[in-house]
A protein has these predicted regions:
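A short, compositionally biased
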Residues: 29-32, 210
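Active-site/ligand-binding neighborhood in enzyme catalytic cores
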Residues: 36-174, 178-185
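Mid-domain catalytic core of redox enzymes
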Residues: 161-238
Length: 238
């Protein structure tokens, strides 16, 4: 069984949520790890003490904090570039943020909000687990379909139905809407921009292509953002 959803791993710090979701699916414990390839050099990621050792030879949290302080450039922090260089410096921005973010969002970092860079705070330890959460796992059979099949058991499902044709405000006290939010409100403030992805699947004649489930390619001259090797999502890859 192959986890076919890419590097999207169920994770939470909430014990109540974890216990609830485990009613519908058996999870296998999994720790997601990511590496960065920048112009052929491999770095630990998210940025942690090993990353800073690879960059500058920092071997202690104190050394790393001092070096980061030296690299910081005064800036408004109003966009992704300004925030990263003001917090972490120009070198870290170029290696880990610029190319990857501009490929992903299809616009210059000066036009990307600073909040994008704040999602993965720098770590002054050697923890390289991508998700710094208490619970993290992958469905044992490789897919999430059974969760939704069990969640929907006994619940009316309407297909080929326009949500706007329903008197949806009276359906429930709380409602989860997963469609385009701009369409729901009849494009009152105009259409929103949506980011899309292009997937290319390749089968390689090797039992180990890159040695990790996810490799991010952060150089702007590489036309893709990452390579995912699905075998590493298994607790016992073969």
């Amino acid at each position: 069984n192959v986890h076919m959803y890419g590097p999207h791993i169920f994770n939470t710090n909430n014990t109540k949520i974890w216990n609830y979701i485990n009613q519908f699916c058996e999870f296998e414990q999994y720790v997601h790890r990511v590496k960065v390839n920048f112009k052929g050099k491999i770095y630990s990621f998210p940025i942690n003490l090993l990353t800073l050792y690879q960059l500058w030879g920092c071997s202690t949290p104190e050394d790393a904090r001092q070096k980061i302080t030296e690299k910081q450039i005064s800036s408004s922090g109003s966009n992704l570039k300004d925030w990263v260089v003001s917090e972490l410096g120009e070198e870290i921005f170029e290696i880990f943020y610029k190319g990857y973010s501009e490929k992903q969002w299809m616009r210059p970092c000066e036009q990307i909000p600073a909040s994008i860079g704040k999602r993965l705070p720098i770590r002054y330890d050697y923890n390289d687990a991508y998700h710094d959460t208490k619970y993290c796992g992958i469905p044992k059979d490789g897919n999430y379909t059974q969760i939704f099949e069990k969640l929907l058991d006994g619940i009316e499902v309407q297909l080929e139905t326009d949500f706007k044709d329903l008197d949806w405000k009276k359906l429930a006290k709380k409602l989860v809407y997963c469609g385009p939010i701009d369409e729901l409100f009849n494009y009152k403030h105009g259409p929103l921009e949506y980011r899309s992805l292009s997937f290319k699947t390749e089968i390689k004649d090797t039992d180990n292509f890159q040695g990790v489930s996810q490799m991010n390619f952060t150089s702007v001259d590489v036309p893709w953002t990452r390579i995912v090797e699905h075998k590493w999502f298994s607790p016992k890859p073969t």
